[in-house]
Amino acid sequence: VRFDEFCFLSGVRATDARDVIMPEAQPTDGLPFHSSPVELQARVVLSRIAGVMESLGGSLENGVYVEQFFTSKEYFEPYRTVGKEYLPSDRPPSTAVPCHALSAEGAVLEVDFTAVLAADPSTRRRISTTESPTVLGGYAQGVRVGDWIFLAGATPADHTKTSSPFPGALGTAVAPDARVDPNLWYGSAIESQVEYIMTSKQGAVLEAAGSSLEDIVKADVYLSHPHEDLRGFHNVWRNLFGDRAPATTIVPIDGFGSEGSRVEIGVVALAKDARSSVERITVPSIAPPVGPYPHAVKAGNLLFVSTLIAADGDGLVDSARPGY
């Protein structure tokens, strides 16, 4: 979908119109172990995205956020190798997470790609700050295009400080300031990690971009243990934002690329000097939001919608229950 300067490509897989894996994305029958399925599928997916962007007068370099889903963590490194062929430098903010399965049989990769075709390319600026730990994947911590700021998904990891200070603990990539002592009952891992991500990582990048936490209009939150951690996440969200929370989506996934991480958060924000207005929307006639955030946030001409499920304060609504 293209709207004004924005381009949104969603659910791009290496499939045909019947949602069957394309022949060029399948390993050769006689040599099944000579090529990786994710490498083959990645070339089809990235070529498709590049083709769409070219048809719109742009390129992959117009990307401001890339969301990648794999069916195995083992596919991350082969995918990254292929990605460098298409974007050898200036890679946009990114998140990459494993999931149990994708909707097309045989698909091991799915990509969402957001781009901004700015009328004036000089308004695009790559955001980098040493106040937040650098990322290992080579992508930008953030990108600002005009009024808009897009940040990469951030976990509580700090790869420069990976050893655990706690006796008896497993190895962890979580930053010391985001850890709780496993030898004590005190503290919440999810709450410590969310607070660290938002204040020490995303907050620092936003400040470098001319923005702040209160200017966030959309947050994508990936949880590896949603049944255990959703309440703790909501506690921190409520404390951070009060009644000015961004539109928030909750995405259950299978893990992260940093040992010990339980959450990853990517955000979209407006700059402090943005001319666009912001409206938080809660609709009284439908079930209240599932967490401490509005149903949606309208920022400029874009509408960002929070997670919506068929539930109210008592659980699943009657009209959504099976008829047996």
PLM regions: where:
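N-terminal presequence-like segments and the immediate start of the first folded domain
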Residues: 1-47, 51-199, 203-217, 224-324
